[in-house]
């Protein structure tokens, strides 16, 4: 009888310890990255941050909004990170959105954008809308 009680106690202790040691998945969050820099260091940083945010919780939602010279990250022939952008789009909850005004000002055609990059009417307006909707804000730059 003592043996049965000891075994039962040990089983309960193991179950409680295992449940206690499991850390709950953090609640998903939404973050908008504001990219206006053509600097490759900044572009690499945003790719790294996307992967880190995704690693915390795969349900986290992200958006990179590019305007000004930030468009270089997703323009064929100007970016050295095309495969990293494609991988991020394919394997994380991230959208890459470019500003239509910046495209017009820089004479960039939609055909020059990497696949699956989306166009928004106004980059600044997009960032503000995300902030108003409760998204976290990260300015990409150094």
Name these PLM-found stretches:
Residues 8-16:
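Bacterial N-terminal signal peptides
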């Amino acid at each position: 009888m003592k043996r049965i009680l000891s075994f039962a106690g040990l089983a309960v202790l193991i179950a409680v310890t295992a449940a206690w040691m499991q850390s709950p998945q953090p609640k998903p969050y939404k973050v908008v990255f504001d990219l206006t820099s053509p600097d490759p260091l900044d572009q690499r940083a945003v790719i790294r941050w996307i992967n880190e945010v995704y690693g915390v919780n795969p349900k986290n939602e992200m958006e990179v909004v590019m305007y000004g010279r930030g468009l270089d990250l997703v323009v064929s022939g100007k970016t050295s990170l095309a495969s990293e952008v494609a991988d991020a789009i394919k394997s994380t909850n991230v959208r890459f959105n470019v500003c239509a005004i910046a495209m017009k000002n820089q004479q960039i055609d939609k055909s020059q954008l990497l696949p699956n990059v989306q166009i928004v009417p106004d980059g600044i307006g997009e960032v503000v809308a995300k902030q108003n909707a409760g998204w976290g804000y990260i300015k990409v730059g150094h």
